[in-house]
């Protein structure tokens, strides 16, 4: 078991030897040499958000709320493409926007969650896709409601430091209060919801705050056991964002953080988005990642539209170059496919 002080020493140390020692440890553990991915369809239900993060291009004041028929059309096409995950995403607390609320009301819905529930239920009944929702902070009761129609859910912790709430990254984002995010991840644990979370590297956090964030995720998982994967995501600069001129984390920073995440989190899968790491993703296989996350043959990454997905053949090719077998998975990991973790109708659908 690696301690916080040992982790900090590792991040600060500039010699290659500690890295090589940790790599040997990781590669000894990962005897299966398997890396997974989920073939998905990314459905941006609505791109308004109450948060205005310094690194985000997803949010738009002139928002678009997808119509029910538009979402069904995407899902039908995704089914033809063989996708198994429907990633439903929208900005946090979109109901705070009166214009969004009015549009939903005209369509006969009391709010965005009722709208989401209906399309998720339709997805389960009419396609081979399984819903996975990531829409910001939700209450215990809201999580319980959506559990009925989701195979898994997600929320990035990003960082456990309250200090970042007063920085350019999160000063206009009340939903990025780490206490709110930790509470939601814990509530998902109480409700037995298979969960994806992660950390964001390069938004002004210190090395200590990176380590604290990973240990916080470990604490939650040891208590509830619901965290199926952790994303180690690198900040990427984009034109016309407040953080446009911020320095991106170096490949070595990412490499070290992936190594630590794998050693600290042990049996939790570690994911790095391949579209944000096209030049370095292959090297991160050696650092301990065992999942590429969602990759879509149909839709773009609406959060990072400038970064196209690699095609599955490309993923397979550079996974094999390092001796890794690429394996498709569902949005819920195999060890969570059980009555304890899934609503009955979702479990039955998976087992068919």
UniProtKB/Swiss-Prot annotation:
Record's cofactor remark: Binds 1 [4Fe-4S] cluster. The cluster is coordinated with 3 cysteines and an exchangeable S-adenosyl-L-methionine.
Source organism, top-level taxon: Archaea
Domain called Radical SAM core: residue spans: 35-275
Enzyme class at the top of the EC tree: lyase
EC number(s) reported in the record: 4.3.1.32
Cofactor: [4Fe-4S] cluster
Keyword annotations from UniProtKB, A to Z: 4Fe-4S, Iron, Iron-sulfur, Lyase, Metal-binding, S-adenosyl-L-methionine
Cited Pfam families: Radical_SAM
Catalytic activity: 5-amino-5-(4-hydroxybenzyl)-6-(D-ribitylimino)-5,6-dihydrouracil + S-adenosyl-L-methionine = 7,8-didemethyl-8-hydroxy-5-deazariboflavin + 5'-deoxyadenosine + L-methionine + NH4(+) + H(+)
Gene3D superfamilies per the UniProt record, alphabetical: Aldolase class I
One MF annotation (Gene Ontology) recorded for this entry: 4 iron, 4 sulfur cluster binding
Residues reported to bind [4Fe-4S] cluster: 49, 53, 56
PROSITE patterns the UniProt entry points to: RADICAL_SAM
Role description: Catalyzes the radical-mediated synthesis of 7,8-didemethyl-8-hydroxy-5-deazariboflavin from 5-amino-5-(4-hydroxybenzyl)-6-(D-ribitylimino)-5,6-dihydrouracil.
HAMAP family with a match to the protein in the record: FO_synth_sub1
Entry similarity comment: Belongs to the radical SAM superfamily. CofG family.
Record note on quaternary structure: Consists of two subunits, CofG and CofH.
Protein name per UniProt: 7,8-didemethyl-8-hydroxy-5-deazariboflavin synthase
Source organism of this protein record: Methanococcus maripaludis (strain C6 / ATCC BAA-1332)
Classification lineage: Archaea, Methanobacteriati, Methanobacteriota, Methanomada group, Methanococci
Gene: cofG
């Amino acid at each position: 078991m690696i301690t916080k002080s040992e982790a900090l020493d590792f991040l600060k140390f500039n010699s290659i030897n500690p890295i090589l020692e940790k790599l040997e440890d990781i590669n000894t553990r990962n005897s299966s040499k398997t890396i997974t991915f989920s073939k998905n369809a990314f459905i941006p239900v609505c791109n308004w958000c109450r948060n205005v993060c310094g690194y985000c291009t997803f949010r738009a004041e002139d928002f678009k709320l997808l119509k029910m028929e538009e979402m069904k059309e995407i899902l039908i096409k995704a089914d033809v493409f063989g996708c198994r995950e429907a990633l439903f995403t929208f900005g946090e607390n979109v109901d705070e926007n009166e214009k969004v609320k009015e549009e939903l009301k005209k369509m006969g819905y009391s709010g965005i969650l009722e709208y989401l529930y209906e399309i998720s239920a339709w997805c389960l009944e009419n396609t081979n896709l399984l819903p996975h929702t990531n829409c910001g902070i939700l209450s215990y009761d809201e999580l319980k409601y959506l559990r009925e129609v989701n195979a898994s859910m997600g929320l990035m912790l990003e960082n456990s430091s309250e200090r970042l709430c007063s920085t350019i990254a999160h000063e206009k984002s009340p939903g990025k209060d780490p206490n709110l995010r930790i509470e939601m991840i814990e509530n998902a644990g109480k409700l037995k919801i298979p969960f994806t979370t992660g950390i964001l590297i390069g938004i002004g956090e210190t090395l200590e705050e990176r380590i604290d964030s990973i240990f916080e995720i470990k604490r939650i998982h040891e208590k509830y056991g619901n965290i199926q994967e952790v994303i180690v995501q690198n900040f990427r600069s984009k034109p016309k964002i407040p953080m446009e001129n911020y320095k991106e984390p170096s490949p070595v920073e990412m490499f070290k953080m992936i190594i630590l995440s794998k050693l600290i989190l042990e049996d939790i899968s570690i994911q790095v988005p391949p579209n944000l790491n096209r030049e370095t993703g292959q090297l991160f296989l050696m650092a301990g990642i065992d999942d590429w996350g969602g990759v879509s043959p149909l839709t773009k990454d609406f959060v990072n539209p400038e970064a196209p997905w690699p095609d599955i053949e490309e993923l397979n090719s550079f996974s094999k170059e390092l001796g890794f077998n690429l394996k498709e998975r569902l949005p819920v990991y195999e060890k969570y496919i059980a009555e304890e973790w899934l609503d009955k109708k979702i479990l039955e659908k998976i087992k068919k």
